[in-house]
Design a protein with these regions (language model features):
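Bacterial N-terminal signal peptides that target proteins for export
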Residues: 1-12
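Intrinsic disorder/low-complexity segments
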Residues: 4-5, 21, 154
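Bacterial N-terminal signal peptides
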Residues: 10-22
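N-terminal secretory/targeting leader peptides
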Residues: 26-121, 133-343
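Intrinsically disordered, low-complexity, polar/charged regulatory segments
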Residues: 128-129
Length: 343
C-alpha cells in the first residue's frame, strides 16, 4: 500500500512538473486588425513579413492572424479595438484620431528634413524613446512599431497642379493634424476621408484630389481615378502597430522580448522602408511604361521655396504656439529634436 502511495505521489509530482511545460509550449495566437487589403503593397512587403519575423523570433510560439480589409474593425476603430480587446493587435493611421497623440504630430509637419519613410520612422521612434511626454500619449496600448510614410505627393483627377495658384480652391483629401493647416495655408480645402473611401469620392468628384504616399496607388486602384501627381514639400503620415496592454502583459517575458527584437526602432525602420520607400520604384516604373496613365510633375526649386515659405515654416510655429497654448510645454524642444534627428 505504501509502495502504491509513493508511486501515486511520484506520478502527481511528474504531472505537476510537466503540465506547465505543456501549457507554455502551446502556440499563442494573436489577432491583428488591418484596414488594408491583404494584396496591397504595404501588407505584402511589410506587415506580412513582420508577422513572419515575429513567428521566427518566438520560435513558432506566437502566431499572428491578420484580419485584412476592415473585416474585424473599421480603420477608424482600430485603436479602440485594440484597447478594448476586440483584437489583440491593430494597424493604425494615427491621423484618424485627432488629439490623441499631439506631440507625435511633430513628424507630420510639412517640410521636415527627412525625405524617406525609413528616416521618418527612425525619428519618431527615437522621439518616443527620448521623451516621456511623447510615449505617455500612446499609453492606452502597447506600442510595437511607429513609422512614417515618405512625404506625401499631391494626386489630382482633372487639374494638374504646378503652382500655388493652381491649388487654390481644390478640395483635397488629407489627414488630420498639421497637414490640414498646411492645405489651408496653401489655399486648398482639406477634406478628411479614410483611404478606402477615396476612390468613390474621386470618381464622383466629391474631392478633386488627395495627399498620400505612392504606396496606396495600386492597392486602392487610385491609378483609375488619378491623372496627375505633383511632388512637393508635403507632410508624411504617421502609423502605429499596437497591442492590447492586458494581452501584452499576459505574455511571458521571453515572448515579449522576442517580439520587441523585431519591433521597436528596427521594426519601425523596416516598416517605413518596405511599406513606403520601396513602393515608389515599381509604381514610377508603371507610370513611365505607360501602364498607369498618370503625369508626374516635380516642383522646381523656386516654386518649391514659395510653398515652403507659405505652407511649411508658418505651420511649424503655429503648431508650437497651439501646443503650448494647450499646456504642452515641450513642443518647441520636441520640434527642434525632430529637425536635428531628421538631418
Amino acid at each position: 500500500m505504501k509502495q502504491m502511495t509513493r508511486f501515486s505521489q511520484m506520478a502527481c509530482l511528474a504531472l505537476f512538473v510537466l503540465f506547465p511545460l505543456t501549457v507554455s509550449a502551446q502556440t499563442i495566437t494573436l489577432t491583428l486588425s488591418d484596414q488594408n487589403s491583404e494584396m496591397s503593397w504595404g501588407p505584402v512587403h511589410a506587415t506580412q513579413p513582420w508577422v513572419k519575423q515575429v513567428e521566427k523570433a518566438t520560435n513558432g510560439k506566437v502566431k499572428i492572424q491578420i484580419y485584412p480589409s476592415e473585416t474585424l474593425a473599421k480603420g477608424k476603430q482600430n485603436w479602440m479595438a485594440a484597447k478594448d480587446g476586440i483584437c489583440d493587435m491593430s494597424w493604425n493611421v494615427m491621423s484618424y484620431y485627432p488629439g490623441l497623440t499631439p506631440y507625435a504630430d511633430v513628424v507630420v509637419l510639412p517640410g521636415l528634413p527627412f525625405r524617406t519613410g525609413e528616416k521618418g520612422s527612425e525619428v519618431i521612434w527615437k522621439l518616443f524613446e527620448k521623451f516621456p511626454e511623447v510615449s505617455d500619449q500612446f499609453a492606452e496600448n502597447k506600442v510595437l512599431v511607429l513609422y512614417t510614410s515618405e512625404p506625401f505627393i499631391l494626386m489630382t483627377s482633372k487639374k494638374q497642379v504646378k503652382t500655388l495658384e493652381d491649388l487654390r480652391g481644390l478640395k483635397i483629401r488629407t489627414v488630420g493634424g498639421p497637414p490640414i493647416e498646411q492645405m489651408k495655408a496653401l489655399g486648398g480645402q482639406p477634406m478628411l476621408l479614410p483611404m478606402p473611401d477615396v476612390y468613390v469620392a474621386m470618381e464622383k468628384g466629391t474631392v478633386d484630389g488627395l495627399e498620400a504616399a505612392y504606396e496606396p496607388i495600386p492597392g486602392f486602384r487610385l491609378n483609375e481615378v488619378v491623372k496627375y501627381i505633383t511632388e512637393g514639400p508635403f507632410a508624411p503620415s504617421l502609423f502605429a502597430v499596437v497591442m492590447n496592454k492586458k494581452k501584452w502583459n499576459s505574455l511571458p517575458k521571453d515572448i515579449q522580448n522576442a517580439i520587441m527584437s523585431v519591433s521597436g526602432l528596427e521594426g519601425s525602420k523596416f516598416f517605413g522602408r518596405n511599406f513606403f520607400d520601396a513602393a515608389r520604384v515599381p509604381i514610377k516604373k508603371m507610370i513611365e511604361e505607360g501602364k498607369y496613365d498618370i503625369k508626374i510633375y516635380t516642383l522646381p526649386e523656386t516654386e518649391r521655396a514659395r510653398w515652403v515659405e507659405v505652407g511649411c515654416k508658418p505651420i511649424w510655429e503655429q503648431w508650437v504656439k497651439s501646443m503650448e497654448g494647450k499646456g504642452h510645454k515641450k513642443a518647441r524642444e520636441i520640434l527642434n529634436a525632430a529637425l536635428e534627428m531628421g538631418k
